[in-house]
Amino acid sequence: MAMWDKIKDQAKTFQQSQGTRGASGSGQGSHGPVGGGRPGSSSGGSKAQLIGMFKSQLASAKNELKSGAYRDASMAMCALVAAADGRVEPAERQRVEELIVSNEVLQNFPADQLRQRFNQHVDRLLANYEQGKAEALQVIAKAAKKPAEARAVVQTGMVVAGADGSFEPSEQYAIREACTALNIPPSEFGV
């Protein structure tokens, strides 16, 4: 539970920095480390609220997240998280697809494109996990050129990972690998 408290604290700090950025009108705020969370802190709030915060942060950047690199990296990230435990049940695949097409930011893209890219990555991961993972991480790494997009890809993965109310160690590991591919310290997201 301490990890969720730390992530929640970081999300609040990040959200506050986004509010400050919006107030300045520059549109080019810092997306650096949002640390400050304390392991073991108990400032209330639930996992659902944390996921809601990530969704809000993504929605606030919706107009900046329209590139093909973000779209492709997000779908690779969603697939990597879904298959992190080495399997993707049909119900899980459907649930993640529903999350993808209902996500406010991802609605910048045609739903069929999103489903196709997500399912393509899932199929590759299930056929040969190591090769599929390497391919997914290559696609994710392409978003590293734009730090705001790179962080949004990680947040998208965290929304998917936390959607079922738990954040499994295999999902945390997948997020850490994606952070490494994006040149973002995993500690920035508490993983």
Which residue stretches match the model-derived regions?
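Small-residue-enriched hydrophobic alpha-helices in membranes
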Residues: 1-80, 90-191
